[in-house]
Amino acid sequence: EAETAGQSEQQPESDSTEHQVADRRGTVAGKSMVERFGQIPGLCLASGYTAPRDLTDLTTLPFLYEDMEPFTNRIIYYETSRGCPYRCSYCLSSIDKKVRLRDISVVKRELQFFLDQNVKQVKFIDRTFNCDHKHAMEIWQYIYEHDNGVTNFHFEISADILREEEIALLNRFRPGLAQLEIGVQSTNPETIRAIHRVMDVDKLEKIVAAIHRGQNIHQHLDLIAGLPFEDYESFGRSFDRVYAIQPEQLQLGFLKVLKGSYMHEHAQEYGIRYLEQPPYEEIGRAS
């Protein structure tokens, strides 16, 4: 403690280690701090887990963008829901199956703030934005009715569950008001079953085509290379089928085997070899 006495106001150098500096004598303060860790719910300590923490009410979380100066000309990342009702084996969101929503009145107030600020792009990070149809429709209706002619909104959706009234509303949007990111990942039926994905590929194609006919929304379709039961030939078929839909952008990613996911538990079963450190990307298959 002698070496750090009188330096509590100085910030430690940034590295991978968490620093705690006690002001003046740290003997008692340090002991109290360590003892208190065990009383904090939701921590994983060397001695084991502390008591579980209740899921956070999203409406109680603070709004982070009151001061927009640090975010000038930057993409704004915004969240109105957490959790996902689907069980995609590569995704950590599948662990939290209970979908929680931020109160819609709060969401509308915050969206209006972004619109008033003429933010260039607001990117929703909700895992499946339209899994709650009422919530999605209220937000889409709001940005349609309050469009400022400048702001673009990005949504990650499941296209095959879009309803007719949702498609009709999207077709009325100003060109550039919204863009949709649609995860296809694979069109191989065996792969889709293996990754626990619920998706009607034929219906997805028709809905993407219906949105495309409106010529007003940028559609960004995703594929993942390296999924179970997907080889070069079958992946090529997935690529050709998605390319034929004519999305404005086709994004190819490589499978990431995230710790805690179903895919991580069964990677050896599928012969998947991957990086043990971030980004945990697949690097090959066992021969």
Where do the language-model regions lie?
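Flexible glycine/acidic-rich beta-alpha junction loops that bind and position SAM and/or redox cofactors
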Residues: 86, 133-134, 184, 190-195, ...
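Radical SAM [4Fe-4S] cluster-binding motif and immediate context
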Residues: 62-213, 225, 286
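Flexible loop residues that form catalytic
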Residues: 1, 29, 127, 185, ...
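Acidic, low-complexity intrinsically disordered segments
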Residues: 1-8, 12-108, 112-116
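Structural recognition of alpha->loop->beta junctions
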Residues: 1, 172-178, 242-250
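Hydrophobic/aromatic residues located in beta-strands of well-ordered beta-sheets
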Residues: 40-41, 122, 153, 180, ...
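Short, electropositive alpha-helical surface patch
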Residues: 137-144, 233-247
